[in-house]
Amino acid sequence: MTTFLIKHKASGKFLHPKGGSSNPANDTNLVLHSDIHERMYFQFDVVDERWGYIKHAASGKIVHPLGGKADPPNETKLVLHQDRHDRALFAMDFFNDNIIHKAGKYVHPKGGSTNPPNETLTVMHGDKHGAMEFIFVSPKNKDKRVLVYV
């Protein structure tokens, strides 16, 4: 399974568990931050063709919409949680640089800024625009894209 960083394309910031713990509690918010360290590495665990779990490599917890609803409303926070179920399935869209939830909403920085400050929450939203693009890069070279479906 490939280990990677999730990089906000417009700002160059990275997805992190808030607080940077190697074993964050369930429902720990996911934020954007400029730091790079081993506690913000991710892996993608394919479950059904293109759908899978975005796994926090250090803890094994996975990315969820807060509350675990099948169709989370706009502005639902993204968190880490230990449970694995269909409501936590995402696809990594390399062609459009999006992360899409099984219900059809996308990962966004809260507020939709192209240059969000450190500690900006990440949320689910149905809009598509340049500020919600993410790329998947190597922990050894933050400018080198990696394939997560391997």
Curated annotation (Swiss-Prot):
pH dependence (UniProt free text): Optimum hemagglutination activity at pH 7.4. Retains its hemagglutination activity throughout pH range 3-10. This protein is most stable at pH 7.4.
Alphabetically ordered keywords of this record: Glycoprotein, Hemagglutinin, Lectin
Glycosylation sites: N26, N74, N118
Residues noted as binding D-galactose 2 in the record, renumbered to the chain: D27, H64, G67, D83, R84, H85
Positions annotated to bind D-galactose 3: E75, H108, G111, D127, K128, H129
Mechanisms controlling activity: Hemagglutination activity is not dependent on divalent cations. Hemagglutination activity is highly inhibited by D-galactose and N-acetyl-D-galactosamine, and to a lesser extent by raffinose. Also inhibited by melibiose and alpha-lactose, but not by beta-lactose or D-glucose.
Coiled-coil intervals, chain numbering: none
CDD domains assigned to the protein according to its UniProt record, in alphabetical order: beta-trefoil_Ricin_MytiLec-like
Presence of the UniProt keyword Electron transport in the record: no
Chain residues that bind D-galactose 1: H16, G19, D35, I36, H37, E119
This protein's record includes keyword Glycoprotein: yes
GO MF term (any one): galactose binding
Lineage: superkingdom: Eukaryota
Temperature-activity note from the record: Optimum hemagglutination activity between 37 and 40 degrees Celsius. Retains its hemagglutination activity up to 60 degrees Celsius, but loses the activity at higher temperatures. This protein is stable at high temperatures over 80 degrees Celsius. The thermal stability is increased by the presence of ligand D-galactose.
Protein name in the entry: Galactose-binding lectin
